[in-house]
């Protein structure tokens, strides 16, 4: 697989879970002998939702909730078959969304 590249994008709401998952992926790739670039922190997506506190009136009294989506990018350069096999077997938390390209 010379000259190839695997790009892994991680998304999660919890920054500690995504950092631990990225660290685990990098350790696995380095242990199998491939070179790795990253984890590169991508911009955090912030969604703000405005909700009226009262069920009937008092529109001036509002509450804001936000959801932050943290993202990381990891590039694996010149992966070996051993690297791909190790990545398939790695156990990551369910709260982390993994997209492999």
From Swiss-Prot:
GO terms for biological process: translation. It comes from Mycolicibacterium paratuberculosis (strain ATCC BAA-968 / K-10) (Mycobacterium paratuberculosis). Gene3D superfamilies: Ribosomal protein S10 domain. This is Small ribosomal subunit protein uS10. It holds the Pfam family Ribosomal_S10. Transmembrane segments: none annotated. One of its GO terms (molecular function) is tRNA binding. GO terms for cellular component: ribonucleoprotein complex; ribosome. It comes from the Bacteria. Involved in the binding of tRNA to the ribosomes. Belongs to the universal ribosomal protein uS10 family. Part of the 30S ribosomal subunit. Keywords: Ribonucleoprotein, Ribosomal protein.
């Amino acid at each position: 697989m010379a000259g190839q590249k695997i790009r892994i994008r991680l998304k999660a709401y919890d920054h500690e879970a995504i950092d631990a998952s990225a660290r685990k992926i990098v350790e696995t790739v380095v242990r199998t002998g491939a070179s790795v670039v990253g984890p590169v922190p991508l911009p955090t997506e912030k969604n703000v939702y405005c909700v009226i506190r009262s069920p009937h009136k008092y529109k001036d009294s509002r509450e804001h909730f936000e959801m932050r989506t943290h993202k990381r990018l990891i590039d694996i350069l010149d992966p070996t078959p051993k690297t791909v096999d190790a990545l398939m077997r790695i156990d990551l938390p369910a709260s982390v969304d993994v997209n492999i390209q």
